Structure formats: C-alpha cells, structure tokens
C-alpha cells in the first residue's frame, strides 16, 4: 500500500491489490467446485455424499483458517516496526499452532464422525460416501493448515501474486486426480465421490511442497532465514494469536456453518433435494469469492489509512469497496438468473435434480445481494481492528434469527426445503443491516479519535 491523492488513484490501487487475492480465492474455491461438479457426474448419491461431507468439513476449516489469519497483521506489524528479526519466531509459533490444530481436528473427527452421520437420516450409500470422502480428505489436513501459515507470511509481505501462482499451479493437479480417482482412469480404482477427498489431500501436499520451496529459495522470503533456528513452543505467543484470531474465526464459522447446518437439516428430504441444494450453494458460493476478495482488500486498505490517521481516505476506500461489491452483487444476481439452466446441467444429468437446482438458484440471488453488503463491511471493520462486536452480530443474525426462521418455514409451512433458503436470506439480511450500523458507529469513533490526536499535536 501507498498514499493516494485522488479517488481514481485509490480505485487503481484497490484493483491492483484485489486481483491476485480474487484469483487466489477463486482458485481455492474451484477445488471444492470441481469436487462437487465431478462427483455429480458420477451419480446423485456421490453428489449427495460429497455434499454432506463438505458441509461438515467446510465450516471447521474456514473457522480455524480464520484463527490462523491473525498471523498476517502480527507479522505485518513486526515488519512495519522494523522488527524483522521477530518474523521467524512469530512464523514458527504459527506453524506449531497450525500443526496442533490440525492434529486436534483429526483426533476429534475420528471420535465424532460416526455418531454425527448416524444421527442423520441418510440413505446408507450416501452416508458411506460422506464418511469415506472425509477420511480421504483427512490425509491432507496437516499440510493444508501448515500452508495457511505460510500463506499468511507471504501475504503479510504484500507478495499476493506468489500465493496466486501457487494456487493456479495446484488447480490442474486437483482436477487431474479428481478425474482419475472419481472415474477410475489410468489404472486407478473407480472411487466415485470418495475419490474427490483423496484428490484434495494429494493437492494439499503439493501446495505445501511448492510453498516451502518458495519461502526457502526465493527472495524476499530467504532474507528472513525462517528455518535457521527452531524455537521452542511459546504459549504466550499462541495466546496473542488466538486472542486476535478467535473472533475472526468464529465470525467466519458462524456464517459458513449456517449453510452446513441447513444442508444437514435437509437430510430429512430425499437425495435429489440434498444434491440440488448443495449444487446451488456451491455455485452461489463460487460467486461469493468476489465480495470476499473485496473484503480482504478493504481490510488492507482501510487498515493502512487508519494506521496513518487519514479519516477521509479510509472513508473513501470504504465507500469505493462497498459500492463495487454491491454492483458486482447485482451482476452476480443477473448471471444466476439468466444462466441457471446451463449451471444446473454442469452438476448433474438427472432432470429432477437439475430442475430443483434451478429453483434454489433463484433464491440464492437474494442472499447474494445481502452478502454484497455484509461481507465488505466486515472487511472494513477488521481494518479498524473491530472484531468482537461483528462476531456477536454474526452469531445472532445467523443462529438466533436465520436458522430458526428457516426451520419453522421448512417444517411448518408448504414451502418445504425452500423455507431454509428464506431463513438464510433473513439471516444474511439481518447481519448486513447490523453491520451497516456498526460501520457508521466505528467511523464516527475514528473521526473523533483522529480529531483529538490532531488537536493534541497542534
């Protein structure tokens, strides 16, 4: 980041920072996208099984990934304070924490997976595929979380294009192993949807290997000599990471887990409905990478201006990012409506499932618009280091308002499964309204603080 004078300069810099982030996010999500699409081509049971497995895994990963994202500002502040010697220490503590988290996830998953699946009203084949898909995926959990730590280091140095390169390099690897393992090509067994789990695990090991080579062999990362000294575990540093990361992680978890909860509650419906719901959520979430990338960029830009106490510049970046997100949300809504039939055909050859996908996609237009407002505002608030109140707002909006509304409509009205989607829309809209109020409050607080600082210096 650098100081800018005009709105045009801000717009150009915003896009320069955002585009590598957007490509990276789309690439990462594309792996889940191709898991779903290619599993759907193997059969409705495979699509439903992967849907259930993903619904259990994605909230866990995104929430814990959010915790580790706290490393980015911690490392960035060390560099900004010219404490470059602290970077290897902070990085290794994050690395140790990521390994501890991944081992805990595997152990807890081994204990609770069977009871969770048994408690769901799943067809036997769907339950088997979901379980074996997650077992396959588990082989890649450790490298995935270690890579997250390395990515935080890379991004904190502003080298977002490196992350983009690694992601784009890994995508064809994921597609290749999906193809050979799901459909049994090149002498591999035909695993169906289960193969998508093993393909993801292989890809995660590949990503980690490339990332390690980059930070060990390529400047500016080599300047830090990250692995020259292996420090002991510091619970004090872990506490610092967790105090900042847990509110971020829980906020992300509450938003992503609401979709997972709806998918799990939909297990009372038939396999076609489960499969169609997951396909629609998958495509809508793919488009969600746009406001998410805008949010990440806003955190960087607004945080930079807040640190420099430039009130109007921070406000301009906020308006710029939120307006851009709303425009892209409208564009995404039009794309979903116009292309809902071709999109449905990407996921399945089953006419009943394809018809249901199209119906769900129409509902997804409305929560796409809510996300276009709520998500960038979250990015702005993180730029202000405001994480605790948005966490509470997310909890109330999604779990106290959204999910109960969806459950009541789905089970006590003629809407059936569509009731859950109305609940999702209600929760997201509530969160967007609450966050808008919080943003105005934080901007007024920042203006007062900056004014007092100027008066004190004059």
Swiss-Prot record:
<feature type="transmembrane region" description="Helical">
    <location>
        <begin position="14"/>
        <end position="34"/>
    </location>
</feature>
<keyword id="KW-0406">Ion transport</keyword>
<feature type="transmembrane region" description="Helical">
    <location>
        <begin position="320"/>
        <end position="340"/>
    </location>
</feature>
<dbReference type="GO" id="GO:0015297">
    <property type="term" value="F:antiporter activity"/>
</dbReference>
<feature type="transmembrane region" description="Helical">
    <location>
        <begin position="56"/>
        <end position="76"/>
    </location>
</feature>
<keyword id="KW-0813">Transport</keyword>
<dbReference type="GO" id="GO:0042910">
    <property type="term" value="F:xenobiotic transmembrane transporter activity"/>
</dbReference>
<feature type="transmembrane region" description="Helical">
    <location>
        <begin position="134"/>
        <end position="154"/>
    </location>
</feature>
<keyword id="KW-1003">Cell membrane</keyword>
<feature type="transmembrane region" description="Helical">
    <location>
        <begin position="241"/>
        <end position="261"/>
    </location>
</feature>
<keyword id="KW-0050">Antiport</keyword>
<feature type="transmembrane region" description="Helical">
    <location>
        <begin position="164"/>
        <end position="184"/>
    </location>
</feature>
<comment type="similarity">
    <text>Belongs to the multi antimicrobial extrusion (MATE) (TC 2.A.66.1) family.</text>
</comment>
<keyword id="KW-0812">Transmembrane</keyword>
<protein>
    <recommendedName>
        <fullName>Probable multidrug resistance protein NorM</fullName>
    </recommendedName>
</protein>
<feature type="transmembrane region" description="Helical">
    <location>
        <begin position="97"/>
        <end position="117"/>
    </location>
</feature>
<feature type="transmembrane region" description="Helical">
    <location>
        <begin position="415"/>
        <end position="435"/>
    </location>
</feature>
<dbReference type="GO" id="GO:0005886">
    <property type="term" value="C:plasma membrane"/>
</dbReference>
<dbReference type="InterPro" id="IPR050222">
    <property type="entry name" value="MATE_MdtK"/>
</dbReference>
<feature type="transmembrane region" description="Helical">
    <location>
        <begin position="353"/>
        <end position="373"/>
    </location>
</feature>
<dbReference type="InterPro" id="IPR048279">
    <property type="entry name" value="MdtK-like"/>
</dbReference>
<dbReference type="GO" id="GO:0006811">
    <property type="term" value="P:monoatomic ion transport"/>
</dbReference>
<dbReference type="InterPro" id="IPR002528">
    <property type="entry name" value="MATE_fam"/>
</dbReference>
<dbReference type="Pfam" id="PF01554">
    <property type="entry name" value="MatE"/>
</dbReference>
<feature type="transmembrane region" description="Helical">
    <location>
        <begin position="283"/>
        <end position="303"/>
    </location>
</feature>
<keyword id="KW-1133">Transmembrane helix</keyword>
<comment type="function">
    <text>Multidrug efflux pump.</text>
</comment>
<keyword id="KW-0472">Membrane</keyword>
<feature type="transmembrane region" description="Helical">
    <location>
        <begin position="196"/>
        <end position="216"/>
    </location>
</feature>
<feature type="transmembrane region" description="Helical">
    <location>
        <begin position="389"/>
        <end position="409"/>
    </location>
</feature>
